[in-house]
Amino acid sequence: MGTPVAARLDPDSRNAFIAALLGWTMDAFDYFLVVLVYAEIAKDFGVSLERMAFLTTATLLMRPVGALPFGLWADRIGRRTPLMVDVAFYSVVGFACAFAPNFAVLLLLRLLYGIGMGGEWGLGAALAMEKIPTGRRGQFSGILQVGYSLGYLLAALAFLLVHSVAGLSWRWLFGLSLLPALVSL
């Protein structure tokens, strides 16, 4: 038995998938920015690299805290609005990291960012997969995962261009965290 030719995605399905892919990509972008500038932030705030590494752990620990309320909210009213609010939330929090005056404030902001990360994946993946035709969900869920690698690549390129080439501080990189909100809204 042959496999039927896959139908083109309708605009609603395509847009939902692109929104989820961009959300996941930009989530990874901001998440990996911290890793790329650990040493510089540690120097600026006078903390050890071990304490800096805790920022990553703290961010990940907060994911479940964001996943549950955003998921419940989405089950009540639909996926789009909670996803847009979530992306705006983590974008603004990521941007605020650029203005952190000390390690404690940066840690608090990364904890809040983790809440946004938790909401984004569940909402984006659910929205995309609900809109994708049943017979193509496996294919598109695989493509969706590429977004995280793409986010890391974009973070590395941003680091290279903004930090290494232009010579701007780590704070400028966090200024780029507003991109997800601008793209999604």
Residue ranges and their predicted role:
Residues 1-185:
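Transmembrane-helix signature of 12-pass secondary carriers
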